[in-house]
Swiss-Prot record:
InterPro entries xref list: Aldolase_TIM, His_biosynth, HisA_bact_arch, Isoase_HisA-like, Isoase_HisA-like_bact, RibuloseP-bd_barrel
GO biological process: L-histidine biosynthetic process; L-tryptophan biosynthetic process
Family membership: Belongs to the HisA/HisF family.
Organism per entry: Allorhizobium ampelinum (strain ATCC BAA-846 / DSM 112012 / S4) (Agrobacterium vitis (strain S4))
Reactions performed catalytically: 1-(5-phospho-beta-D-ribosyl)-5-[(5-phospho-beta-D-ribosylamino)methylideneamino]imidazole-4-carboxamide = 5-[(5-phospho-1-deoxy-D-ribulos-1-ylimino)methylamino]-1-(5-phospho-beta-D-ribosyl)imidazole-4-carboxamide
Main localization, broad class: cytoplasm
Keywords per UniProt: Amino-acid biosynthesis, Cytoplasm, Histidine biosynthesis, Isomerase
Protein name per the record: 1-(5-phosphoribosyl)-5-[(5-phosphoribosylamino)methylideneamino] imidazole-4-carboxamide isomerase
Length: 244
């Protein structure tokens, strides 16, 4: 079980949004590299980064900030937001990313994801962002008619490293993870699932470590870490203890 601290990038700064709304952004750190190093120093082993401007623009926008993060931390980093082509993927992996997250392109062009998995084994994750059980695309600005499990099943056996499942209705508002839909997805596919959206307290960490949730690869935490609602040392100690 991995707890992924999140850095969301908007205009070169580390922010959190409420419900995926770019107008509701709180700046938590103007220096993303320093934030990445702080998470590493706290004992986290991975880092989850999203280029928010990129997700809306359909191309990487916060490249300089991502490079600063990669220079600042030794931890593996996964990045999503605006990565829509094989050339994009290759460029970012050459920059030192450990994993690239494909979201909109997974809906628009599933064949590209499958091809990427062949070219870059173990390096491709799929981001599934859902609102009301349906997949959202283009930085959450647009809804599709595609169901979450329906999309996930398209990549069964393709070699996807993980599915990052975000419940947009809970993102950034600290109401707790949508366990029902998250575990339903984890039960439906053999691809490892990472929960995102709504992690609110140490109770969510405890819930994550219960037997039925052990099938999850981990969870992503943003606002709860920044606001001090989850103490990194306590959370990481719980996870470590559960590993036995």
């Amino acid at each position: 079980m991995i707890l992924f601290p999140a850095i969301d990038l908007k205009d070169g700064q580390c922010v959190r949004l409420k419900l995926g709304d770019m107008e509701q952004a709180t700046v938590y750190n103007p220096d993303p590299g320093a934030q990445a190093k702080a998470f590493e120093d706290q004992g986290f082993e991975w880092l989850h980064v999203v280029d928010l401007n990129g997700a809306f623009a359909g191309e990487s926008v916060n490249g300089a900030a991502v490079d600063a993060i990669l220079k600042a931390t030794k931890n593996p980093v996964q990045l999503g937001g605006g990565i829509r082509s094989l050339a994009h993927i290759e460029t970012w992996l050459q920059h030192g990313l450990s994993r690239v997250i494909l979201g909109t392109v997974a809906v628009r062009d599933p064949a590209l994801v499958i091809e990427a998995c062949k070219l870059f084994p173990g390096k491709i994750a799929v981001g599934i962002d859902a609102k009301g059980g349906k997949v959202a695309v283009e930085g959450w600005a647009e809804a599709s008619e595609l169901g979450v499990v329906e999309l996930a099943k398209k990549f069964e056996g393709a070699g996807v490293a993980a599915i990052i499942y975000t419940d947009i209705d809970r993102d950034g508002i600290l109401t707790g993870i949508n366990w029902e839909s998250t575990l339903e997805l984890a039960d439906a596919v053999s691809i490892p699932v990472i929960a995102s959206g709504g992690l609110a307290s140490i109770e969510d960490i405890r819930r994550m470590l219960e037997p039925d949730a052990r099938k999850l690869e981990g969870a992503i935490s943003g606002r709860a870490l920044y606001d001090g609602r989850i103490d990194p040392a306590e959370a990481l100690a719980l996870i470590q203890a559960a590993k036995g």
